[in-house]
Amino acid sequence: VQKIITEGGRARGVLTADGREITAKCVAANVHPQILLQKLLDEKMLEPPEQRRIEGYRSHSATFRMNVALSELPQFTSMAGRGEEHFMGAIEVSPSLQYIQNAYYDTRQQGWAKKPVISMQVPSTQDKSLAPEGGHVASLFCQHFQRHLPDGRSWDEVKHEVADMIIDTIDNYAPNFKASVVGRQ
């Protein structure tokens, strides 16, 4: 999405990067507030006091989000022999408070956790249309990442390295995970 189309003070749709206009009764955005209010919306949508407030807004915490296509369900060692029904909720990779604390400390030093806190959902266990027969999709919500990396690199430069590290982290708990990943975004 390149821009949110507004009319009469209301969102009416979006303009995509390839120039298509898509109209909608409702537009939802899952982006940083500054991206939404300073880049996607027309600047005239905010009064000057609100513009100043959003310009002064600072956040440092971020998350790393990715989706993976899987050839099979992860086989977590802690859930050996468990069926698909055990994947219908969230699976958390955060085995202890110390693990979570270490993830936070890593982030303060290098910009991301060496062993991140990961929340995994496998929606294909409930909606079979999301993946081919026998396959699955998983959504990974990973915590303890800085928005701006302390060494000056951009997230575009390190995103593949970090995605590999996230997959390796899950593989420590579900040894078939890495080999089952057939696609990722």
Model-derived regions: residue spans:
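Mid-domain catalytic core of redox enzymes
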Residues: 2-131
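FAD-dependent oxidoreductase catalytic-site/capping-region signature
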Residues: 116-185
